[in-house]
């Protein structure tokens, strides 16, 4: 994938002193593949550098890690593109991840971030990630850190010593943006750098008309679960909420049935016109206990 060229494009160039970035990257790849900790690698490998070399490499603010991640992902996708068969879908997935970080002085860490894994609020980093998935592979394309109002440190505390045009400053300054803004910016960067996909999958947090409209303008059909609440959508016609639309259609539509594990369900779809989004497809899936609603801007 011409990794040396990608490193140069991402400003990974050798300085006056130190080791070439390409060699250090290879060491990190080896640690990842062999599942070795850095301390173990340094202790047991004759070719390892001193630990300070790896720490300086990671902390270097001039390296554009985001560009390196996107360009390398796009290059890998081009290599595996011939493996795709007709009918297989390529997906971009926007997801939120909570990474526990207990320290008070960690950049971007926040208090009272809800963790679905631990089922409680914890001190953590709130990470918005853009991932790629198909029938053969899945990997991360981009990510951003979102800082909420319960931040542990002020932004000025870790940007004051950085040049305002540096990659590090720009990256650390974006954490006050909204999740929707971060997600759209990541999607736009990925598409501009040659990442190709058929659909964008998001959770109910991003299932808002303005976000879906912006994704459609970038050429990405959106599939998402909608929150089944009393929220009023600007649908054209008499019925405005999900339950109202479901009740009006459930007796006049042919229902299909299925089973997932021990859960039996019935579902049907309908084409509805929205004031902002135009014609969209809604899929209503009922498990007997819960009603799940999904939206797709691809009505084919």
Name what the model sees in each region.
Residues 27, 41-44, 88-102, 130, ...:
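Short, conserved catalytic/metal-binding motifs centered on acidic residues
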Residues 60-150, 264-270:
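Active-site-proximal, Lys/Arg-enriched surface segment
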Residues 1-67:
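Gly/serine-rich nucleotide phosphate-binding loop at the start of the catalytic core
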């Amino acid at each position: 994938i011409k990794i040396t060229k990608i490193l140069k494009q991402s400003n990974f160039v050798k300085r006056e002193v130190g080791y070439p970035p390409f060699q250090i990257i290879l060491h990190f790849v080896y640690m990842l593949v062999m599942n070795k900790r850095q301390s173990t690698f340094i202790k047991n490998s004759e070719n390892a550098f001193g630990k300070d070399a790896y720490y300086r490499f990671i902390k270097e603010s001039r390296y554009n890690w985001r560009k390196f991640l996107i360009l390398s992902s796009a290059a890998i996708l081009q290599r595996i593109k011939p493996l795709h068969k007709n009918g297989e879908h390529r997906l971009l997935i926007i997801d939120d991840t909570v990474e526990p970080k207990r320290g008070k002085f960690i950049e971007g860490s926040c208090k009272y971030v809800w963790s679905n894994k631990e089922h409680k609020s914890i001190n953590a980093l709130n990470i918005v990630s853009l991932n790629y998935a198909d029938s053969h592979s899945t990997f991360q394309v981009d990510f951003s850190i979102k800082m909420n109002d319960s931040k542990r440190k002020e932004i000025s505390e870790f940007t004051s010593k950085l040049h305002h045009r540096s990659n590090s400053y720009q990256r650390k300054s974006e954490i006050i943006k909204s999740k929707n803004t971060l997600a759209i910016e990541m999607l736009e960067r990925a598409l501009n750098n040659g990442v190709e996909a058929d659909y964008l999958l998001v959770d109910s947090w991003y299932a808002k008309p303005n976000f879906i409209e912006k994704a459609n303008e970038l050429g990405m059909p959106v599939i998402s679960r909608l929150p089944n609440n009393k929220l009023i959508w600007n649908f054209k016609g008499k019925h405005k909420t999900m339950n109202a639309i479901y009740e009006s259609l459930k007796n006049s539509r042919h229902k299909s049935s299925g089973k997932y594990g021990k859960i039996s369900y019935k579902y049907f779809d309908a084409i509805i016109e929205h004031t902002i989004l135009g014609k969209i497809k809604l899929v209503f899936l009922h498990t007997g206990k819960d009603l799940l609603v999904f939206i797709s801007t691809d009505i084919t």
